Amino acid sequence: MKTFVAKPETVKRDWYVVDATGKTLGRLATELARRLRGKHKAEYTPHVDTGDYIVVINAEKVAVTGNKETDKLYYWHTGYVGGIKQATFKEMIARRPEAVIEIAVKGMLPKGPLGRAMFRKLKVYAGSEHNHAAQQPQVLDI
């Protein structure tokens, strides 16, 4: 008997919607990354994108534990000399709440072309409205 290897054209991808209200950021991101990779499926193959599409709503209501709301810092660079910027978790939630979940999940995915393809299947929205109703996403309770 040979080892099963999934083929990209035969992978069945489902759509799921996840409500981030009150969920802990790291625990939520871990499960999202796992499902984007497809590790929850029996047909998981490391070099093939077998994951599902995931729509995250209410990203602005995601929670962190302890003092991370004020102590956790996000850094980025503008590209100019001396252009290093930083913002706390609280400031990031106020400015761009989707980025908090996107950054957390992106760090948990493989680096390279396959990881970027997996990341493109993650859709994050700050509010409760999303524009993927045509895909009929199933509610996923994490």
UniProtKB/Swiss-Prot annotation:
GO terms for molecular function: mRNA binding; structural constituent of ribosome. InterPro entries: Ribosomal_uL13 (IPR005822), Ribosomal_uL13_bac-type (IPR005823), Ribosomal_uL13_CS (IPR023563), Ribosomal_uL13_sf (IPR036899). Transmembrane segments: none annotated. GO terms for biological process: negative regulation of translation; translation. One of its GO terms (cellular component) is cytosolic large ribosomal subunit. Gene3D superfamilies: Ribosomal protein L13. Keywords: Ribonucleoprotein, Ribosomal protein. This protein is one of the early assembly proteins of the 50S ribosomal subunit, although it is not seen to bind rRNA by itself. It is important during the early stages of 50S assembly. Part of the 50S ribosomal subunit. Belongs to the universal ribosomal protein uL13 family. This is Large ribosomal subunit protein uL13. It comes from Histophilus somni (strain 129Pt).
